[in-house]
Amino acid sequence: MLSQRLQCSKQFARHLSVAAKDGSGKVSTLSVQVQGGSRYATKDGVAHLLSRFNFHNTGNKSALRLVRESELLGGRFQSTVDREHITLSATFLKEDLPYFVNALADVLYKTSFRPHELAESVLPAATRDAAVARACPVAAAEEALYSVTYRHGLGKPVLYDGVEKVTLEDIKAYADKVYTKENVTVLGQGINEADLKRFVNDSLLASLPSGTSLAGSGNAKTHSGEARLRHAGSSVAAIAVPVAKADFATYEVLARYLTSDLYALSPLVHKAKLDKYTDGGLFSLYVKSAEAAKAAADIKKVVADLKAGKDISVARKYAALQLAVENDSAASPVSLKLENAKDFKLGKFNYVAVGDVSNLPFADEL
């Protein structure tokens, strides 16, 4: 690590997983990861709506009181959703750890789920989230790649779009399903692990009900295909490759190589990344341009170059450095044997065109 060596350990108290990494700084970050992302959703968008319900009124505190108290302590809360998790997090001064452990526990255990909050706050916020995502052609391309590749499970939409009706009872039922000990992991950054474990055991987190672990229960079956979406603004052409866990190192190095100065065509690549899940991953690459003709030319060049084969071993140390820096500030570090990454040759892939699709290529033209 580039900073001082940090001690990391995991504890399992009554099926509740707790992991922490201490540090010498004055600021701590506490996260509660819930295995309840969109891949596990009982209805499209219910995970997003549940995430948006976090930090509203609970049985012990009003939303206003919760916000005001945290502000007086200089802290802040956040709730996010992705395909794997709903994550509740708080950033605060180290000495205020007990308050924020109890605050997050209160949200998971005693959120009130009041009808007026759904209509007046949760739905408008979720609708805004979806509108922002729809306005971004890269986000639209990513959503389409997942839909094409997985169809179900990981292919479900992350954000609520209003297509499938979700009621307050649906949200409460989903909370009951995912807010259980088996689906919750408490992560601390800049926090002493023994202290965190003690405060967690003294909080309502220890009183969460038992349930069924959802990890690995999502449908990760993959498919081949392409999609084309008309979209005003910039045009995006994107490809995706499903990745087995055994190949994570190769695609991690590849993603970082493609956006580095080590790759001659990196100026053409808008974004490349590897999304890692419990049962596999998805590598995706995006080309973006205000002109569809340029996006078309760029994706053809990049795909042709990758089909010819690349020696990505030159990027192993670059990728290792980036990963080390990220791990240094992560409560849950990623461990990959990057030295195994050598040659890469692009084979089958899924393809999505977003924007001026009349002037973007089809998959069989790449």
Swiss-Prot record:
InterPro entries tied to this protein: Metalloenz_LuxS/M16, MPP/UQCRC_Complex, Pept_M16_N, Peptidase_M16_C
Where does the source fall among the domains of life? Eukaryota
Specify one Pfam family.
Peptidase_M16
Q: Which GO terms describe its cellular component?
A: mitochondrial crista; mitochondrion; respiratory chain complex III
Q: Which Gene3D superfamilies match?
A: Metalloenzyme, LuxS/M16 peptidase-like
Q: Name one GO molecular function term.
A: metal ion binding
Keywords of this entry? Electron transport, Membrane, Mitochondrion, Mitochondrion inner membrane, Respiratory chain, Transit peptide, Transport
Location of the transit peptide in the chain: 1-15
Task: Give the GO biological process terms.
Answer: mitochondrial electron transport, ubiquinol to cytochrome c
Question: Function of this protein?
Answer: Component of the ubiquinol-cytochrome c oxidoreductase, a multisubunit transmembrane complex that is part of the mitochondrial electron transport chain which drives oxidative phosphorylation.
Q: How does it assemble?
A: Component of the ubiquinol-cytochrome c oxidoreductase (cytochrome b-c1 complex, complex III, CIII), a multisubunit enzyme composed of 3 respiratory subunits cytochrome b, cytochrome c1 and Rieske protein, 2 core protein subunits, and additional low-molecular weight protein subunits. The complex exists as an obligatory dimer and forms supercomplexes (SCs) in the inner mitochondrial membrane with cytochrome c oxidase (complex IV, CIV).
Family, as annotated: Belongs to the peptidase M16 family. UQCRC2/QCR2 subfamily.
- What protein am I looking at? Cytochrome b-c1 complex subunit 2, mitochondrial
Q: What is the lineage of its organism?
A: Eukaryota, Fungi, Dikarya, Ascomycota, Saccharomycotina
